Amino acid sequence: MILLQHAGLPPPKRPSSSPPMSVAARSTGALQLPPQKPFGQEASLPLAGEEEPPKGGEQDTALEELCKPLYCKLCNVTLNSAQQAQAHYQGKNHGKKLRNYYAANSCPPPARMSNAVEAVAAPAVSVPPQMGSFKPGGRVILATENDYCKLCDASFSSPAVAQAHYQGKNHAKRLRLAEAQSNSFSDSSEVGQRRTRKEGNEYKMMPNRRNMYAVQNNSAGPYFNPRSRQRIPRDLAMCVTPSGQFYCSMCNVGAGEEVEFRQHLESKQHKSKVSEQRYRNEMENLGYV
């Protein structure tokens, strides 16, 4: 080695100290294995965000037509913003009506309805169609107080929103106005009934006044009877004077109307006079007088 260094020649290469590689190891090192996937992703399973294609395409398209971004035709609710629409479509009322819709059509509901709520930049609010044309399975779902206020013409997305509306000032003001209108209508109807009754009484009194004037103008002689056309009952025929008045000779009392005269006949004074007269007649018949 010293001689080689002096001569300027490079030293010979020494063999490496690592053991020789076996044939199996060489063959393994020569093969290129594919990169392994992390644990849990060996099988091609669908992720949580992915959705399976819905079954019953016709029914899903009909349901998407019912559930518009700002109008839910299934619940008959008009929505004002995308946040309110999202809250409505995720609420209990919409879920219940959705289950009823699928039950009426005898089709299992999907796990998730796609494209139900979409972000709308400039929504064009359209007039909702009439509910009479829509008949899902021949079943009509009526709106409740938690869905719609008929007095204020307002729709709600949840019972909490409905409760807040019913406790607000606007609803209370509308309620007071409605009560005032109903009271005024009832008062006006009562006044109208009173007027009709009064007019009827005045109309009845007018012919009587005309008859009185005619009697005064057409009276001729002391034997004129203005009640000649009036029907006189048989039991009172002997108590009517030629002038048409009723007269009680026993009590020396007269009356112009039949009702007043009958009241006199049923009075205690008249009955006492009648009993006295009977007693006198009986005594005369017996010869005591």
Curated annotation (Swiss-Prot):
Polar residues bias (residue ranges): 180-191
An annotated Gene Ontology molecular function: RNA binding
Region called Disordered, residue ranges: 1-59, 180-200
Alphabetic keyword roster: Apoptosis, DNA damage, Growth regulation, Metal-binding, Nucleus, Protein transport, Repeat, RNA-binding, Translocation, Transport, Zinc, Zinc-finger
Top-level taxon of origin: Eukaryota
Matrin-type ZnF: 70-100, 147-177, 246-276
An example Gene Ontology CC term for this record: nucleolus
Cell compartments where the protein resides: Nucleus; Nucleus, Nucleolus
Pfam family for this entry, one: zf-met
GO biological process terms, semicolon-separated: apoptotic process; DNA damage response; protein transport
Cited SUPFAM superfamilies: beta-beta-alpha zinc fingers
Compositional bias segments (type: Pro residues): 9-18
InterPro entries tied to this protein: Matrin/U1-like-C_Znf_C2H2 (IPR003604), ZMAT3 (IPR052644), Znf_C2H2_jaz (IPR022755), Znf_C2H2_sf (IPR036236), Znf_C2H2_type (IPR013087)
Function: Acts as a bona fide target gene of p53/TP53. May play a role in the TP53-dependent growth regulatory pathway. May contribute to TP53-mediated apoptosis by regulation of TP53 expression and translocation to the nucleus and nucleolus.
Subunit-structure text: Interacts with dsRNA.
Protein's UniProt name: Zinc finger matrin-type protein 3
The species this protein was found in: Bos taurus
Phylogenetic placement of the source organism: Eukaryota, Metazoa, Chordata, Craniata, Vertebrata
Encoding gene per record: ZMAT3
